[in-house]
């Protein structure tokens, strides 16, 4: 099992498009991939679950990967998460 702490860009969160993109990427891996914001936990392969996560107050989230391709999966998801920008109105 691999656990990574990731700091998102200021104001960024899992709104519709980034959540969908991340879920599509996550489904390419066998590993179980979970993202937590505080006490809330979501399956990274489920866009709706990601969208339900609260906006991280300090931008900090935790990514947990467990499975045969956990290192590759965690690296790919971290890269994708770091590109998420805040939703412009």
Which residues fall in each region the model found?
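Short amphipathic
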Residues: 1-10
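Conserved beta-strand core positions
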Residues: 4, 33, 59-61
């Amino acid at each position: 099992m691999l656990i990574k702490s990731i700091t998102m860009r200021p104001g960024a969160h899992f709104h519709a498009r980034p959540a969908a993109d991340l879920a599509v990427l996550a489904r390419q891996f066998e590993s179980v991939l979970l993202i937590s914001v505080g006490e809330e936990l979501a399956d990274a392969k489920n866009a709706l679950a990601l969208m339900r996560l609260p906006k991280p107050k300090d931008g900090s989230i935790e990514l947990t990967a467990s499975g045969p391709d956990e290192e590759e999966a965690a690296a790919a998801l971290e890269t994708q998460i770091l590109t998420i920008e805040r939703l412009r109105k």
